[in-house]
Amino acid sequence: MELVNIFLETDAGRVKFVIKNTDDVCASELINKFVELLSEYIHIDQSEFYLVVKDKDIFYFKCDRGSISIVNNEFYVFDEPLLFVKDFTKITGVEFIVTETMPCRIIPKNNHAVISVVTNHKFYNGLSL
């Protein structure tokens, strides 16, 4: 299972948030684990953001100052071709892909950068536009 709208920025490039071997783990535990991982880089209790999780389907969650809730699917596909790296030395920040209906307010920790990129790529009637 992976986050498709939040990535780590490093000295070498962008890195995915992925949790492997998730067959026997419930979705709420995985979301809590993603938020726990993010808490190393941002103040969760002061931030508001969305997590878009992809397994076989895409699921949307909102984290509002640490309170997590599932939200309706917005039909954004998050399928732009992005480049990722596997080897890096230092994490420099966190990148959030946001949409017009998924605003965010992020308070970083320890001088980490917060990068935001906007997308409006939606799924319409069987087409990804």
Swiss-Prot record:
InterPro entries, sorted: Virion_core
Presence of the UniProt keyword Phosphoprotein in the record: no
Keyword set, alphabetical order: Late protein, Virion
The keyword Ribonucleoprotein is annotated on this UniProt entry: no
GO CC, alphabetical: virion component
Induction (UniProt): Expressed in the intermediate phase of the viral replicative cycle.
Cysteines engaged in disulfide bonds, as pairs: none
Annotated compartments: Virion
Family named by the database record: Belongs to the orthopoxvirus OPG073 family.
Official protein name in the record: Core protein OPG073
Annotated source species: Monkeypox virus
